[in-house]
């Protein structure tokens, strides 16, 4: 189970730069015009063989240059509640501010370890400013420069040393893990209640630390499954969940620990930015997807035409991944709830699809010969052999070609679409790799 590292701090201390440094990305919030928040605050990192997730909670705050103290407080409370390790970023060039003091007051009550990161220590002289931060009462300030990378390797060592030991979970690998995710008020709690009913349906619960996901095993409607449950569904939130960054961070653990994500959309509101943010997390983690249009009972025009238009809109907003089941349901009336579980199980089975090598080549090579990759500067690309990789999280295929470097993304999407036409891969991402033959 991945550990979660949260970066907190007041504006302009270098949180985004540190996030990019830790996740080895250039998806900077820095120097970027405001737009969609997808993919900007969440990333994966690995150090000393330990994989963990990094979240910059401040990335969801609008107009962070003029942030209100209340928003900072909510951001820090979120980190205290959710994170395994908290990075409190301060600025050695500006010294201790009133806002730093307020953040530190909250963090001193945190159960998770807090590492105070003294950023912008771009030269040795600036290190002499760091002792000022002892007054915050959070131990030693750790000097780094997020821009140059100075000190970040040692910081990663320290982060990993703070992680709890891996919890051993006794889970049956043959039983699917479903997570219900979605923005606030989309009906997550209602559909969970519709799934599980009374507590007597619980078979067993397995939990690690208080911040770990709880895997609750159920047998409903003849289905055996684990429901991945985090604090976000049943626990009363300490922070107002209307905050966009809050609902997205809440979804991280559920998504990471699930096989299939049931994404709830509100039929009365359509697709909103938070839905796309959560979808992005699902795709980044390569999880199966079932989309549920909840509150369909509140829509007056329930004609087949309206359903088709609604479905087309969703697929266009979720593109390029469009091969997933969409179910129009009502958690309140339990309309099509059984269908949701059926589709989730089907997607789980599709994730484990194994296609024999002989069939892959029989079906795909004639198609490739008829529609070959576009030539590049007079060089013709030939794909000669296809095989499926073993032991992968999702179906993954290798196409062996003479000039793999010239096979572009549009042609890979063409191959993926043709594979989805020939085999049932609905709801699951697939990977296509082009390699030298």
Swiss-Prot record:
CDD domains the UniProt entry points to: EngA1, EngA2
One Pfam family recorded for the sequence: MMR_HSR1
GO terms under biological process: ribosome biogenesis
Keyword terms: GTP-binding, Nucleotide-binding, Repeat, Ribosome biogenesis
Domain KH-like: residue ranges: 353-437
InterPro entries for this protein: G_ENGA, GTP-bd, GTPase_Der, KH_dom-like, KH_dom-like_a/b, P-loop_NTPase, Small_GTP-bd
Chain positions recorded as GTP 2 binding sites: 182-189, 229-233, 294-297
Gene3D superfamilies linked to this entry: 3.30.300.20, P-loop containing nucleotide triphosphate hydrolases
Domain of life: Bacteria
Domain EngA-type G: 3-167, 176-352
Binding site for GTP 1: 9-16, 56-60, 119-122
An example molecular function term from Gene Ontology annotations: ribosome binding
Cystines in this chain: none
Function text: GTPase that plays an essential role in the late steps of ribosome biogenesis.
Assembly and oligomerization: Associates with the 50S ribosomal subunit.
Assigned protein family: Belongs to the TRAFAC class TrmE-Era-EngA-EngB-Septin-like GTPase superfamily. EngA (Der) GTPase family.
Name by which UniProt lists this protein: GTPase Der
Origin organism lineage: Bacteria, Pseudomonadati, Bacteroidota, Bacteroidia, Bacteroidales
